[in-house]
């Protein structure tokens, strides 16, 4: 029976019209600011759209749509909102066509303010540029152009400072510049600049940096902003130590427990409690320092075997050792220096901090001047310039300007979507354009702070939390009104319950920045119909798969929180290698599980049936229904793509690596370097050795012998003149081409140069013939496109392009390999959790949960925080000493806690993407050791896990497993850890259902309810029970044989043209095809040039040429015979056709087609799709009648549709026949080819989900149309 109670909300019920009471309240709330806290899957976008629609269609007090300001997070969301409003208006107008107001709203919609914040700012600046002295012709620089301008400005600033020989600047370089250059200091200046620009008044923030370090003599450290933060840090650690000691005391007091330890444990528990109380009551720092100075842990008394159970003694010792480690870490980290020394360190940093702030100001001015010279602004400028138009800085903050007052008067309401992701600058802008005052406030904000995952873009979830705390629930009062949407209409009960179970335990105010209370919990509202009997396997339980990582001798899974203290080096490399190995294992497991869910596992479960809301029925799972979500795709995603490819699973992933490392791109970039400057030995040798020139290693040696000294280019020139036969000729040809390319580089565009290189070397065509040729050519096309995009910026030329690429590579950035598949195809999507936000999928795998949190940024020399300012590392160059200042320790703690809260929210977003099935995958080393750590807080009273444990977690898996170890389905985890503590009854009896699986280092998987328990018994040398049902299952699997023997030998894939031939033979009564009777698909290679010159094109090649022309014709202009011939000539110029192919294409017959009824219908269509490939599975019995007894077998059919025309009420399907061979009467042609068209139509209706209303054959030779019914 499912549990209900105060912490477990009942299932929601829908109101009339499909809206719940919560949603209706959010739609209709008026009179004051409103904050809607909308949990995942609660329909917040629909609620926001309905609120807007009701405001503009209100019969009593309607509002014009252009008097609403609607702010969205993305342009796609803005377009979706505008379309929702358009459709709603169209429906209302159809019901009330006489309404002039509705007609007016439809006309105003195009100019309505529905956009992102940046788009709103851009529009405002276009109108009010003159108020801030902005050039009216300004444009927005893209990220590439802005980065190049920034680099130039920063180098200019540093050159000036070096020329001035400033001692303080020199000290700044010595302390923070790096070992060999000033690269780290340049990075520090950019970091400080970007952080300052995230605040409404950057100058004020920079001014405040040094103030906190100018401490007067005798100043108390307690008066600094960092003192309280460090006490909070100590408090969390000490609370964890207290919990460990309490667990040790419980074990020591058990029968058979190590009572000899009690005296030590009680004394140490009292000590930790006193320290904890001192931190909580904000005792003076000097007092705390004196307390910690006296802290010692005495050795434990000996515990003999006859006095206590040694197993219990070991557990108590482990808990006590953990507590000791925490306390001594607090002592050494925060209380190793007296407060006077802490203040002295801060005072020493003041001159350097002041110099850094001045450097940032100088860079800002130089960068602004450089942008003005080019007539550009960057994205940050849009917000700050907009703020200059809207606000003036007053004593207590921003004061609305005249423009702001005009906008306040204009906008009846300001509606903000994804409010949790805005920053302080955007918040100030919204405050300036919204009204204030009792009954006048008009700001409507929708968001979910649990899904605020853009802190790396300097979003501030604290803005949402502050309003949530200050606004009143229910009918209002105070500063505004707070509403909640909790009914989840996306996920099944099993997913909802699992999410609630985890986050009630891990999301606490201290670590998660908020409590996961009743207002935050999800309530099941999806109302899935029951699965019909016999329609596939369905399981409500959430799965968690544990993969054994690395050697079993090491402990892992989060002991070192993401390498927080690591410096990189060998440890970092080993960690990366281990994560890549874990990624491969997880990918293999996920691939196997996907095949099982699709019913592709012999002897395995049936295909999973999912509920299709559009079809309103259950259907089998397909690849496009599955998503694999990763915290970060770098490294891990490649493993999944490769493993899925190996298993035959189509997958799509937006990879951000692998582009610059691809051989074809490396080769072309080397050639571009040689064109820019041929006196570069390594690129030149690489180009000569590459297929673009094709020399051998021995040839390079002979070239060098031609001129042993000097540049290799001089040797190439000498060898080309040395008369060495073929080698000299090839080098002379290369040098001639090189001069031509250098001329193009000087006189033409970069894109023209790259395409000339492709054409002249034949390298583009060559790569297409290699394995993976399609991908290689896509990469080369992408290089051409990026060169073209680069020249749309203020930068031009080959040198700057190569410099830009070099900067990207030095910064570890990559474009990612060009993509051949689209995510809209029937593929498994592999994406980052950030990319998945706002999406939903029937089946979700969340993988990589054992990857360490990335805290490496916390080891930078200087840290920044919006409230705490700057935290520097103290560097004493003379004494060669470096240590963190108290400011840095405070910032490091605060930033780490904020990062943990962000990781928690990212996990929440990932788990709430699932509609029907959620599968979690993570890896860990030394599973029993990890289990002991996970079970440490198992006996904690109440729902929330201890803050000390949560803050010490190194991976999401630590959180998940510690929570699951307290569930009844996690009993095997506790047994594996030999955990004697029982979890609280209310937690253990939670309504959620879980299945935990363990996969060892060899990839063998078993449900953790069985194998880990047995493994633990073997390790404890305990006897095992008889084999039981497991032995029977193994025997059945080993003796299994494939039941559909008759299917073997039949082709699993066929082209449509082959099916036509088979249908013809079956219709003629010929004997059925046997094994090997099906013709295989053949690739027709182009004939050698000498054969083409003698013989011309075959009929098949001429037909291919005509199809190519029909595919590429521009349908927007005239298509008479003159226009058709002109387009064919253009295709020859563009190298889509050869001259021989063009001569074989009957232009007059194409013109006749377009002059006829079918051609006119094609031109009038809403959308025309040409040469559309497809792959479709059909029942094998449809092709092989003898396989009727095997209904589960399928054959893949693939083909290419010549033309598909969308006519609004359905598709018109066309198939061209171009041969000159007589086809007999129209009835004969229809009999031969209409079966082929029926398969095409079926594929279209199945894949695109729309009806094909008519099918036509068009025979070009006689110019005949034949309808296929």
Curated annotation (Swiss-Prot):
Molecular function per GO: 3'-5' DNA helicase activity; 3'-5' exonuclease activity; ATP binding; ATP hydrolysis activity; double-stranded DNA binding
GO cellular component, one term: DNA helicase complex
Domain UvrD-like helicase ATP-binding: 17-492
The UniProt record lists the keyword Isomerase: yes
Enzymatic reactions: Couples ATP hydrolysis with the unwinding of duplex DNA by translocating in the 3'-5' direction; ATP + H2O = ADP + phosphate + H(+)
Keywords associated with the record: ATP-binding, DNA damage, DNA repair, DNA-binding, Exonuclease, Helicase, Hydrolase, Isomerase, Nuclease, Nucleotide-binding
Pfam families: PDDEXK_1, UvrD-helicase, UvrD_C
Name recorded for this polypeptide: ATP-dependent helicase/nuclease subunit A
Species in which this protein is naturally found: Pelotomaculum thermopropionicum (strain DSM 13744 / JCM 10971 / SI)
């Amino acid at each position: 029976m499912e549990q209900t109670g105060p912490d477990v909300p009942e299932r929601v019920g829908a109101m009339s019209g499909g809206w719940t009471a919560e949603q209706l309240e959010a739609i209709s709330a008026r009179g004051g600011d409103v904050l809607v806290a909308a949990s995942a899957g609660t329909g917040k976008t629909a609620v926001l759209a309905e609120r807007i629609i009701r405001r503009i269609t209100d019969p009593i007090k309607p509002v014009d749509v252009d008097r609403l300001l609607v702010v969205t997070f993305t342009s796609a969301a803005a377009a979706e909102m505008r379309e929702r409003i358009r459709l709603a208006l169209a429906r209302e107008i159809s019901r009330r066509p006489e309404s002039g107001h509705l007609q007016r709203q439809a006309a105003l919609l195009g100019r309505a303010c529905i956009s992102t914040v940046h788009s709103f700012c851009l529009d405002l600046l276009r109108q009010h540029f003159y108020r801030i002295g902005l050039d009216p012709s300004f444009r927005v620089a893209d990220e590439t152009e802005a980065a190049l301008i920034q680099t130039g400005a920063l180098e200019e600033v540093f050159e000036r400072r070096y020329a001035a020989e400033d001692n303080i600047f020199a000290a700044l370089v010595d302390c923070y510049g790096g070992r060999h250059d000033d690269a780290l200091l340049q990075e520090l200046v950019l970091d400080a600049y970007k952080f300052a620009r995230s605040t409404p008044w950057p100058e004020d923030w920079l001014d405040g940096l040094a103030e906190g370090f100018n401490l007067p003599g005798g100043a108390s450290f307690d008066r600094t902003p960092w003192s309280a933060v460090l006490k909070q840090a100590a408090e969390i650690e000490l609370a964890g130590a207290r919990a460990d000691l309490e667990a040790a005391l419980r074990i020591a007091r058990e029968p058979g427990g190590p009572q000899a330890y009690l005296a030590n444990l009680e004394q140490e528990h009292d000590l930790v409690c006193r320290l904890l109380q001192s931190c909580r009551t904000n005792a003076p720092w000097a007092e705390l320092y004196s307390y910690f100075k006296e802290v010692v842990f005495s050795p434990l008394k000996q515990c003999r075997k006859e006095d206590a159970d040694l197993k219990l003694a070991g557990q108590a010792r482990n808990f006590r050792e953990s507590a000791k480690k925490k306390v001594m870490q607090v002592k050494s980290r925060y209380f190793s220096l007296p407060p006077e020394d802490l203040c002295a360190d801060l005072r020493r940093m003041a001159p350097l901090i002041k110099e850094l702030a001045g450097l940032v100001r100088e860079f800002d001015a130089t960068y602004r001047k450089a942008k003005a010279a080019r007539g550009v602004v960057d994205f940050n400028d849009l917000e700050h310039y907009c703020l200059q138009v809207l606000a003036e800085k007053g004593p207590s903050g921003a004061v609305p300007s005249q423009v702001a007052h005009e906008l306040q008067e204009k906008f009846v309401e300001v509606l903000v979507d994804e409010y949790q992701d805005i920053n302080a600058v955007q918040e100030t802008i919204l405050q300036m354009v919204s009204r204030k005052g009792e009954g006048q406030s008009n700001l409507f904000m929708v968001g979910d702070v649990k899904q605020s995952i853009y802190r790396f873009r300097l979003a501030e979830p604290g803005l949402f939390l502050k309003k949530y705390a200050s606004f009143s629930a229910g009918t209002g009062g105070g500063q505004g009104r707070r509403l909640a949407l909790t009914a989840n209409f996306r996920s099944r009960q099993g997913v909802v319950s699992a999410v609630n179970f985890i986050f009630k335990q891990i999301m606490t105010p201290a670590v998660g920045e908020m409590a996961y209370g009743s207002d935050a919990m999800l309530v099941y509202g999806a109302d899935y119909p029951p699965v019909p009997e016999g329609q596939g396997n369905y399981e409500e339980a959430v799965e968690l798969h544990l993969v054994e990582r690395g050697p079993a001798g090491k402990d892992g899974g989060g002991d070192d929180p993401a390498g927080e203290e690591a410096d990189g080096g060998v440890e970092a490399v080993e960690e990366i290698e281990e994560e890549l190995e874990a990624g491969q294992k997880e990918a293999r497991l996920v691939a196997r599980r996907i095949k099982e869910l699709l019913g592709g596992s012999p002897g395995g479960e049936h295909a999973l049936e999912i509920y299709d809301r559009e079809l309103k029925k259950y259907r089998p799972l397909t690849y496009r229904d599955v998503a694999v979500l990763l915290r970060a795709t770098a490294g891990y995603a490649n493993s999944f793509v490769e493993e899925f490819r190996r298993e035959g699973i189509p997958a799509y992933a937006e990879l951000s690596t692998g582009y610059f490392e691809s051989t074809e791109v490396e080769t072309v970039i080397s050639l571009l370097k040689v064109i820019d400057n041929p006196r570069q030995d390594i690129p030149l040798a690489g180009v000569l050795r590459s297929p673009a020139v094709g020399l051998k290693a021995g040839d390079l040696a002979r070239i060098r012998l031609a001129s042993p000294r000097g540049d290799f280019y001089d040797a190439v020139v000498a060898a080309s003149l040395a008369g060495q036969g073929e080698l000299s000729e090839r080098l002379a040809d290369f040098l001639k081409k090189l001069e031509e390319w250098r001329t193009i580089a000087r006189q033409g565009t970069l894109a023209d140069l790259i395409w000339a290189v492709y054409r002249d070397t034949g390298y583009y065509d060559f790569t297409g013939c290699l394995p993976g040729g399609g991908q290689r050519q896509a990469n080369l096309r992408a290089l051409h496109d990026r060169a073209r995009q680069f020249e749309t910026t203020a930068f031009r030329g080959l040198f700057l392009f190569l410099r830009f690429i070099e900067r990207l590579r030095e910064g570890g950035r990559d474009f990612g390999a060009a993509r051949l598949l689209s995510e809209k195809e029937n593929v498994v999507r592999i994406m980052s959790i950030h990319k998945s936000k706002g999406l939903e999928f029937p089946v979700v795998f969340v993988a990589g949960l054992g990857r360490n949190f990335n805290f490496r940024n916390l080891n930078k020399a200087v840290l920044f925080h919006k409230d705490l300012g700057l935290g520097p590392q103290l560097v004493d160059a003379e004494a060669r000493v470096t240590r963190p200042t108290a400011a840095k320790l405070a910032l490091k703690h605060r930033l780490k806690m904020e990062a943990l809260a962000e990781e928690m929210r990212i996990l929440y977003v990932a788990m709430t993407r699932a509609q029907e099935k959620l599968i979690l995958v993570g890896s860990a080393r030394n599973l029993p050791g990890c289990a002991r750590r996970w079970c440490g807080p198992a006996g904690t009273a109440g729902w929330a896990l201890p803050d000390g444990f949560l803050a010490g977690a190194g991976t999401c898996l630590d959180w998940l497993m510690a929570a699951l170890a307290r569930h009844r389905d996690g009993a095997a985890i506790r047994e594996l850890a030999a955990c004697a503590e029982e979890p609280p009854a209310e937690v253990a009896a939670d309504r959620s259902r879980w299945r935990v699986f363990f996969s060892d280092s060899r990839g063998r998987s078993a449900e953790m309810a069985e194998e880990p328990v047995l493994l633990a018994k073997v390790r404890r040398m305990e006897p095992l029970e008889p084999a039981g049902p497991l032995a029977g299952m193994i025997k059945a699997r080993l003796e299994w044989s494939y039941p559909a023997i008759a299917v073997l030998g039949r082709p699993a894939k066929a082209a449509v043209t082959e099916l036509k031939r088979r249908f013809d033979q079956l219709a003629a009564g010929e004997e059925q095809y046997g094994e090997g009777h099906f013709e295989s698909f053949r690739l027709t290679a182009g004939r050698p040039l000498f054969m083409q010159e003698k013989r011309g094109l075959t009929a098949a090649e001429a037909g291919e040429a005509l199809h190519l022309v029909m595919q590429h014709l521009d349908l927007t202009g005239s298509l008479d015979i003159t226009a058709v011939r002109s387009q064919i000539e253009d295709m020859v110029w563009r190298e889509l056709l050869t001259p021989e192919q063009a001569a074989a294409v009957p232009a007059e017959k194409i013109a006749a087609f377009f002059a006829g009824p079918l051609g006119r219908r094609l031109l009038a269509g809403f959308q025309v799709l040409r040469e559309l490939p497809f792959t479709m599975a059909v029942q094998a019995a449809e092709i092989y009648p003898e396989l009727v007894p095997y209904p589960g077998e399928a054959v893949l059919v693939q083909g290419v549709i010549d033309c598909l025309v969308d006519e609004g009420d359905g598709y018109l399907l066309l198939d061209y026949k171009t041969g000159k061979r007589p086809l007999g009467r129209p009835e004969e042609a229809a009999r031969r080819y209409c079966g082929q068209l029926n398969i095409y139509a079926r594929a279209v209706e199945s894949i695109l989900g729309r009806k094909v209303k008519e099918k036509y054959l068009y025979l070009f030779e006689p110019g005949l149309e034949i309808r296929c019914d």
